[in-house]
Amino acid sequence: MALSEAAQKVQAALLERGLETPMVPCGLSREERKDKIEQHMRAILGLMSLDLTDDSLADTPRRIAKMYVDEIFSGLDYENFPKITVIDNKMGVDEMVRVQDISLTSTCEHHLVTIDGTATVAYLPRKKIIGLSKINRIVRFFAQRPQVQERLTQQVLVALQALLETKDVAVKIDAVHYCVKSRGVMDATSSTTTTALGGIFKSNPATRAEFLHQPR
């Protein structure tokens, strides 16, 4: 299936900026990938001494394969990029558009455990405006990949800059990393904040402060 114009534009912008997730061509269909992942997960679980003949575990390798391809890593495939509605700014909107408390669940690419958090996204309309729900969908698309939070934040920024044809975009993500919470240091209370600021959000202290410190 051919990629949408929006998907191609976003992918090209990320590649140009060196911000694309490290990926190599697979050459397999979605179902072929599921079959391969299922086979490997069966081997991994067997090496962990789990009895895959038990009715509770028998379908686990297939469940994991479907979850990886269709759900939590679906953002690796640009065929899943959301349908985007960008329209001309005929109303002349020139004040900040801000969407906050966007829920996101991603996966740490170092340990493949959960990243759980929220995003705040804002832009100053120029020539184009975007349907508000599309901002949430773009955040979700890039979250559905193995990620590091810093790259995720930048990817959302660059995607919106490319689609809206303006640098005036800002993104902030607050998240809990389960690679910190459930293993290693096992810190259950810390969280991580990352920001990506473009255009006037970076160059103008007042606009930056309005974005970063606006009351909830």
Curated annotation (Swiss-Prot):
PROSITE patterns: GTP_CYCLOHYDROL_1_1, GTP_CYCLOHYDROL_1_2. It comes from the Bacteria. Pathway: Cofactor biosynthesis; 7,8-dihydroneopterin triphosphate biosynthesis; 7,8-dihydroneopterin triphosphate from GTP: step 1/1. Zn(2+) binds at residues 108, 111, 179. GO terms for molecular function: GTP binding; GTP cyclohydrolase I activity; zinc ion binding. Coiled coil: none annotated. Keywords: GTP-binding, Hydrolase, Metal-binding, Nucleotide-binding, One-carbon metabolism, Zinc. Its EC number is 3.5.4.16. It catalyses: GTP + H2O = 7,8-dihydroneopterin 3'-triphosphate + formate + H(+). Disulfide bonds: none annotated. GO terms for cellular component: cytoplasm. GO terms for biological process: one-carbon metabolic process; tetrahydrobiopterin biosynthetic process; tetrahydrofolate biosynthetic process. It holds the Pfam family GTP_cyclohydroI. Belongs to the GTP cyclohydrolase I family. HAMAP family: FolE (MF_00223). Toroid-shaped homodecamer, composed of two pentamers of five dimers. This is GTP cyclohydrolase 1. It comes from Shewanella amazonensis (strain ATCC BAA-1098 / SB2B). The lineage of its organism: Bacteria, Pseudomonadati, Pseudomonadota, Gammaproteobacteria, Alteromonadales.
